Design a protein with these regions (language model features):
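Active-site beta->alpha loop and helix N-cap motifs at the rims of alpha/beta catalytic domains
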Residues: 1-122, 135, 142
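Rossmann-fold NAD(P) dinucleotide-binding segment
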Residues: 44, 286, 410-430
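Glycine/small-residue-rich loop that forms an oxyanion/phosphate-binding "nest" at active or ligand-binding sites
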Residues: 52-96, 286-335
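Catalytic alpha/beta core domains of metabolic enzymes, predominantly
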Residues: 92-224
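Glycine-rich adenosine-cofactor-binding loop
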Residues: 169, 224-231, 316-321, 328, ...
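Phosphate/diphosphate ligand-binding glycine-rich loop within oxidoreductases
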Residues: 222-332, 437, 443-445, 449
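Adenosine-phosphate binding glycine-rich loop
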Residues: 332-336, 427-429, 433-476
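Short acidic low-complexity segments
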Residues: 386-400
């Protein structure tokens, strides 16, 4: 189930908020702490035909309650007499509100600013206290900026327990916990009704969970592939993969996450039965460190942007260079299987992304040269890759067929370390592999000057298709 929180300040508007939430949610959390005046709780509970979870939170637990603690307890006792399906009680006061009627009890442990205990024993103690407080469900709210912060509870919910667990992780990996919680049997996950109504920054909306993450299709058997990042480009790719996997009848989904360092990542992935990790396009050094071996095309130290668990070994793959060059070669056209053969290709950049493209263009038989904002670094890359180096002072006298822009920090201009826009001229074909899905200033400039352009959307689609093919063995 999806639980949507409503936080009305007016009794008059409370029913409208409940009605709006009932159209998309399976369970509605009615937060009484935001109301200015005492409500008729029974009237509100009967306002919609969806289950209601009543809560009234103190400021220390993220709520807006300004009255006394005794007044809050009295309001919770009144609420339980109205017999909503659920009531949320803080762990430290749950024993002061006795069970009543058919209302089930969510006993909540909240730590807004401190992570959960590092040991399982500390988590077990909370469960024991919740059980003594007559809990039907245990709820945890805590900071989850990374997988490591979410780990104490994730390691617990991935195993069978007597009490069901729900969680509201504050931070990016709260989404990670929610999707894994669905797999491991959490009764519900929390979502905002729409943008601007999030309980915390980054909380997914109902639309996000349905359209991007397809959460209703996640089952115990679902295989997760982790994705490094929560930015818009990563989440768009998550949505594309999940839609294609769903259409193909594949029980696999992408799982956005973030981690602090590599020291425990493989152990955590193994426990959570996560089958792979999609890194940053163009190679992720952290994934390269974890790869026990690489696909043959990458050689011993080629850039890794996909890590897959193959027969117990973590194997590294490179997808961006292949996908970007497929898009480039499609734009070049012709009947040759290697359209780059004997064409002069200039790669501009000196970092990992540039190294990836030099690697790929060389394999596709292009006549590759390297230039960059720093001549020394460009010369080192050229020497390491056994290709030609073009000093900045000679760049504008260099005739090339294809220009691959592979510098995320590329600046257009006449200054030192900048790319003068006048260099971009027809009949050059321009590919910017740092563009993502959007036009960059360099792409816009190249297009305005009459150059051919490999459209960013085309490259993005090709990368998504390459990842889908590498992970599933099927075409998208």
């Amino acid at each position: 189930m999806i639980c949507i929180s409503v936080t009305p300040e007016s009794r008059r508007l409370a029913k409208a908020d409940l009605l709006n939430a009932s159209r998309q949610g399976d369970l509605i959390e009615l937060c009484l702490d935001h109301l200015v005046k005492s409500p008729d709780i029974a009237d509100l509970v009967e306002a919609v035909d969806k289950p209601i979870l009543v809560a009234c939170r103190r400021s220390q637990d993220g709520g807006q309650w300004t009255g006394s603690e005794e007044e809050r307890l009295q309001l919770l006792r009144q609420a339980i007499v109205a017999e909503p399906e659920w009531i949320e009680l803080d762990l430290d006061i749950a024993s002061q509100v006795p069970r009543y009627g058919k209302t089930q009890r969510v006993v909540a442990y909240t730590s807004l600013y401190q992570p959960l205990g590092a040991s399982r024993a500390e988590i077990d103690q909370i469960f024991e206290k919740a059980q003594k407080a007559d809990a039907d469900v245990v709820k945890f709210t805590w900071p989850t900026p990374t997988l490591e912060a979410a780990w104490p509870l994730l390691s617990v919910v991935s195993q069978s327990r007597d009490l069901p667990v729900v969680g509201m992780g504050l931070g990016d990996c709260g989404l990670t916990f929610s999707l894994l919680g669905r797999k491991y049997g959490s009764p519900w996950i929390y979502a905002a009704l729409e943008r601007g109504m999030e309980a915390y920054e980054g909380q997914p909306t109902v639309g996000d969970l349905d359209e991007v993450h397809r959460w209703r299709e996640i089952r115990t058997s679902t295989k997760f592939i982790a994705v490094d990042g929560f930015d818009d480009a990563s989440l768009a790719m998550v949505g594309a993969f999940n839609a294609a996997a769903g259409d193909a009848g594949l029980d696999a989904r992408w799982l956005p996450l973030a981690w602090a360092d590599n020291s425990r990542l493989v152990q955590m992935l193994d426990v959570l039965k996560i089958q792979g990790v999609v890194g940053r396009p163009g190679g992720d050094e952290r994934l390269g460190e974890l790869a026990q071996r690489r696909e043959a095309a990458l050689g011993p130290d080629g850039p890794v942007d996909l890590l897959m668990n193959k027969d117990g070994n973590w194997q590294g793959f490179g997808c961006l260079w292949r996908a970007a060059l497929l898009a480039l070669e499609a734009e070049l056209g012709g009947e040759s299987e290697t359209p780059l053969d004997r064409r002069s290709v200039l790669v501009i950049g000196t970092g990992p992304l540039a190294r990836t493209m030099v690697f790929g263009a060389t394999r596709r038989k292009g006549l590759v040269s390297v230039a960059g904002s720093d001549d020394g670094m460009a010369q080192q890359l050229a020497a390491a890759s056994d290709v030609r180096f073009v000093p900045a002072q000679n760049l504008y006298d260099t005739l090339v067929d294809v220009v691959i822009l592979a510098d995320p920090d590329l600046v257009l201009g006449p200054g030192r370390g900048e790319l003068n826009p006048s260099f971009l001229r027809p009949p050059m074909l321009i590919l910017d592999v740092a563009a993502g899905r959007e036009d960059t200033p360099a792409i816009e400039e190249a297009r305005s000057r009459g150059c051919g352009v490999v459209e960013p959307e085309t490259v993005w689609t090709s990368v998504t298709e390459s990842l889908f093919r590498s992970i599933t063995g099927q075409s998208m």
